[in-house]
Regions:
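Short catalytic/metal-binding and nucleic-acid-binding patches
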Residues: 1-160
Length: 160
């Protein structure tokens, strides 16, 4: 699945905003979400996960993280991002002044182990393809560290 900040605004350049995402994923893991892999880039994140109520979990994730990140941006008076989120808000979102996430989360069905491994490799390569790092495990906000034997930032399920 991919969750993207509205208009690809680079919000996840601050550790505090990424920590909100990771804390939320950790909480949902305790509630039954199995996170197999993730990568957080500056304006979106990829998650490979499984749950009996995946759509509900992702809606909870997006609602909670949007609320917490917007609160943080307001507390820090980061008006450039807040103004962009207000400007690009979808017109039909009349119940709010700001929109944080693009609509949807674009889930893809993973049918077997081979496909799962391909998807994990693909998302872990994202920061490498962008030229940010040389090896996937060098990206701090990625489960590639877990798969290379290092300690990651959140619990990852490696057995599927």
């Amino acid at each position: 699945m991919t969750c993207t900040v509205l208009h690809w605004i680079p919000v996840f350049t601050r550790p505090e905003t990424v920590n909100i995402l990771l804390d939320s994923l950790s909480f949902l893991s305790q509630e039954g979400l199995k996170v197999y892999a993730y990568v957080v880039l500056e304006n979106h994140l990829h998650i490979i996960a499984q749950s009996d109520q995946l759509e509900k979990d992702m809606l909870r994730f997006k609602a909670h993280t949007a609320r917490k990140i917007l609160m943080l941006l307001r507390e820090r008076n980061i008006h450039t991002i807040l103004d962009q989120l207000a400007f690009y808000k979808k017109a039909h979102k009349t119940d709010r002044k700001l929109q944080f996430w693009q609509e949807g989360f674009h889930p893809e069905w993973i049918s077997d182990d081979k496909m799962l491994k391909q998807k994990i490799e693909y998302i872990h390569q994202n920061p490498v393809k962008r030229g940010y790092i040389d090896k996937p495990e060098h990206w701090r906000y990625s489960s590639a560290r877990d798969y290379s034997g290092q300690d990651g930032l959140i619990e990852i399920y490696k057995q599927w």
